[in-house]
Design a protein with these regions (language model features):
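Extreme N-terminal, non-catalytic leader segments
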Residues: 2-52
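Short gly/ser/thr-rich secondary-structure transition/capping motifs
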Residues: 36-39, 129-133, 179-182
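Short glycine- and Lys/Arg-enriched binding-loop motifs that mark or flank ligand-binding interfaces
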Residues: 47, 56-58, 74, 179, ...
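Residue-level preference for short coil/turn positions at secondary-structure junctions
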Residues: 49-50, 77, 143, 175
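Conserved P-loop
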Residues: 52-140
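Generic detector of well-ordered alpha-helical packing
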Residues: 86, 151-152
Length: 219
């Protein structure tokens, strides 16, 4: 007589019977109702209304682009916005060409360009400090609903700005003012202070395949 494997004793057979459409529909509805209950509860608990601090960091493409997308949304809601760029030094980009036609936007290109191009730490630090003076003016202006501090994180990486001073200024801003900070290698203290942090990971990048920066995609 053939012996049964001990693990096969009393093991129920998996059902292979197809689920009819009505049963599948009912199960889906039950799952979605449970999910809706959880989400509705979270929405009800999120009652605070104040300005938020967003940080877009990571090695992937799109940190600044995402911030400008939020700015478009803010303008659609009748808000006023300002942009201070800490590293970029180009004024011929597509985003500037587009947003310069919006009277609700103030835009300041205050960087000296990539550090490997300038090769002058004192000059880069002075530019960052001037940019922060402009940013601080907006942080004290309740008329600005959204402030984008583009590539600010590099000022901490290279020691151009004092992180504690920046965090104190951010904390003292008008209560309904939103701020978006972009750039790689966001310091942990900034991440801790932020309300929303997105870490954009680079999976692939066209530049590494030998494709040049393309208008409309990179600038």
């Amino acid at each position: 007589m053939a012996m049964k494997h001990p693990l096969s004793e009393n093991k129920p057979m998996a059902s292979t019977a197809p689920i009819d459409a009505d049963t599948a529909g009912t199960r889906h509805q039950d799952r979605m109702q449970r999910k809706k209950t959880v989400i509705d509860q979270r929405i009800a608990e999120a009652a605070a209304r104040r300005g938020v601090l967003l940080v877009n960091t990571g090695t992937g493409k799109g940190k600044s682009s995402a911030a400008f997308g939020v700015m478009a949304r803010a303008l659609g809601n009748g808000m006023h916005a300002a942009v201070v760029q800490f590293v970029k030094n180009r004024t011929d980009t597509g985003e500037i060409a587009f947003f310069r036609n919006c009277p609700q936007v103030s835009w300041h290109v205050m960087g000296e360009g990539f550090t490997w191009e300038t090769q002058d730490r004192a000059r880069d630090a002075a530019a960052a400090q001037s940019a922060w003076a402009q940013a601080r003016a907006y942080l004290n202006d309740a008329r600005i609903d959204l402030l984008i501090l583009d590539e600010l994180t590099y000022a901490f990486k290279y020691g151009w700005l004092d992180l504690d001073t920046v965090l104190a200024d951010l904390a003292a801003r008008p209560p309904m003012q939103h701020v978006i900070i972009t750039g790689r290698a966001a310091p942990q203290a900034l991440i801790d202070a932020a309300d929303t942090v997105t870490d954009m990971a680079m999976v692939k990048h066209a530049f590494r395949s030998g494709i040049a920066a393309m208008p409309g995609m990179e600038f």
